[in-house]
Amino acid sequence: MTFSALRRHFLLASLTLTLGAGLLGQAQAADDLLAQIKSKGEVRVGLEGTYPPFSFQDENGKLAGFEVDFSNLIAKELGATAKLQPTKWDGILAALESKRLDLVINQVTISEERKKKYDFSDAYTVSGIQALVRKGDEGKYDAPEKLAGVKVGVGLGTNYEQWLREHVPQADVRTYEDDPTKFQDLRSGRIDVILVDRLAAFDMVNKTKGAMALTGAPFARQEAGIALRKGNPELLAALNKAIEKFRADGTLKKLSEKWFQADVTQ
């Protein structure tokens, strides 16, 4: 091989390596969701928007609530703004899988089953599965076994439905796509009990001025984390870093006390 041919071969090899590295870098950047979020300056967050005090529409029609505030704080730590996308619960994780959402911040309980499909941040609230009844019925349904044969309302596809079917298969399970209808059916007597997040139950008792009541201690402990698609370690690390910061500087506690008058974050 002549010197000129050798030189051409070397230049072609160098060019190939350079182009290959560039394409690899572009592919990695395309796959790095955190980088995409920072580049766009926007993170798409899924929440229900009908689940007070976590997310709901205020008197002006604007989204408000604990998880609305929390989403905005998280987005700021990621160098972006939160694009809040109200989504029904039974489709919210599917929207995450199909990449219509980047994150779901909607009291998604961390469970071993869900961890097979999604990654979760560290927990940002700690609660439990709470039975909520009409005032005066507290003693009737204060244990899981007392729900056998009883009309129990749960959100469709929620961990409450799953827990009820697993632990009280004799219950008369009534599923709902939205919370307002479920609460209305309890008040009107169409169902006897609803299973909800303990924190949401406290809020409902306050709003109904004592027309509803908790049956006692929660039936099971649950922790909620931010759900995201697997394969985004940089984003997961950034979320955990933000949550740890908010926990350490008291931001999470203040936010909790604003919406629940108690610290529900640990």
Short names for language-model regions:
Residues 41-47, 143-157:
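Short loop->beta-strand "edge-of-pocket" segments that line small-molecule binding or catalytic clefts
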Residues 29-107, 116, 249:
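Extracytoplasmic small-molecule ligand-binding "clamshell" domains
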Residues 68, 84-94, 139, 174-184, ...:
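Short helix-initiation/N-cap motifs at beta->coil->alpha
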Residues 69-77, 137, 150-151, 155-159, ...:
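Extended ligand-binding regions for polar small-molecule ligands
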Residues 91, 108-116, 163-166, 187-220:
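A ligand-binding cleft/hinge motif common to bilobed small-molecule-binding domains
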Residues 43-44, 79-81, 98-106, 150-151, ...:
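Alpha-to-beta junction loops
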